[in-house]
Amino acid sequence: MSRMNEGTTARILLVDDHPMMRRGLRDLLELESDLEVVGEAGNGEDAIHLAQQTEPDLILMDLNMPGIDGLETTRRMRDADIDARIVMFTVSDEQSHVLEALRNGADGYLLKDMDAE
């Protein structure tokens, strides 16, 4: 896995089936000069293909997507030797999902805060 050094740009792949979520994340991440969104995917199959093409440092992965879900996508990415850090980014706070994500190769689990404050 490539390690980030001072002065380098982190390459990020966004994986979520909701285009508005991807757009919002992209807009926020691109406010930082050391973060670059290198691709977006709306499903697991496209995510695997893009990860192989773009070789991101970080993948933000939604859990619930049509076709193969984020858990299976993560497992397939690890089986394909995709070594980017994978962080599940989801509304699900079920302990079983957290544990399964980590078992399938995720490096972290981040909750989408959906409460309006």
Positions of PLM-derived features:
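Conserved acidic segment of CheY-like receiver
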Residues: T9-M21, L25-L29
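Active-site residues of response regulator receiver
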Residues: D16, D62, T90
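Short hydrophobic/Thr-rich beta-strand motif most characteristic of the beta2 strand and flanking loop
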Residues: D34-G42, L50
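Acidic catalytic/metal-coordinating carboxylates
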Residues: N43-D46, I68-E72
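Short amphipathic alpha-helix used as the core "switch/output" element in two-component signaling
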Residues: H49, L71-D83
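Active-site beta3 strand of CheY-like receiver
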Residues: T54-L60
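Receiver (REC) domain active-site loop signature in two-component systems and cognate sites
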Residues: M65
